[in-house]
Amino acid sequence: MPAWLLAVAEPVTEATEGSAEKGILDAILESNLINIAIILSLLYILGRRVVGEALAKRREGILEELRQAEQRKQEAIERLAEEQQKLAQAQQEAERIRKQAEANAEARRQELLQQAEREIERLRANAERDLSAEQEQILQELRRQIVRQALSKVEQELPQHLNEQVHQRLIERGIQMIAR
């Protein structure tokens, strides 16, 4: 029997030997104390094992949860490292694409500038050609007008200066020029 049970039971037995006449109430009280002591002893003996097993199971459960949490933490760290690596690669790819886009835009800008320069040169050449053609046309028109005016003036003045001899000489010269 455990020592604490003996310590509780000893005063109870002394009380029962010295006072048998105290009555039924004392007997009930004494028996209740004994019953409580027995129940507490049984609870201690049986409960220690049950509580110990429950605590051991709980401890194992907590340890398992800690192991799983540590494993999840490690997996999360690995995934984080992978995702950070992917992010770094994506940022490098984005930077490469941005630089390529800038290079393409610059090349396109240069191409458009060259195209515009060629178009300007073509328009200048066309304008010069059109201007030359128009100048030539205007000169020809001026020559025609001058010839018409000269002919008109000659026709007006010729009859006044022309006599029969001069007329005959002009005809002969014209024939000689044709004959040559």
UniProtKB/Swiss-Prot annotation:
The chain crosses the membrane at residues 33-51. One of its GO terms (cellular component) is proton-transporting ATP synthase complex. Keywords: ATP synthesis, CF(0), Hydrogen ion transport, Ion transport, Membrane, Thylakoid, Transmembrane, Transmembrane helix, Transport. It is a single-pass membrane protein. InterPro entries: ATP_synth_B-like_membr_sf (IPR028987), ATP_synth_b/b'su_bac/chlpt (IPR002146). GO terms for molecular function: proton-transporting ATP synthase activity, rotational mechanism. The keyword Transport applies. It comes from the Bacteria. It is found in: Cellular thylakoid membrane. F-type ATPases have 2 components, F(1) - the catalytic core - and F(0) - the membrane proton channel. F(1) has five subunits: alpha(3), beta(3), gamma(1), delta(1), epsilon(1). F(0) has four main subunits: a(1), b(1), b'(1) and c(10-14). The alpha and beta chains form an alternating ring which encloses part of the gamma chain. F(1) is attached to F(0) by a central stalk formed by the gamma and epsilon chains, while a peripheral stalk is formed by the delta, b and b' chains. F(1)F(0) ATP synthase produces ATP from ADP in the presence of a proton or sodium gradient. F-type ATPases consist of two structural domains, F(1) containing the extramembraneous catalytic core and F(0) containing the membrane proton channel, linked together by a central stalk and a peripheral stalk. During catalysis, ATP synthesis in the catalytic domain of F(1) is coupled via a rotary mechanism of the central stalk subunits to proton translocation. Belongs to the ATPase B chain family. This is ATP synthase subunit b. It comes from Synechococcus sp. (strain JA-3-3Ab) (Cyanobacteria bacterium Yellowstone A-Prime).
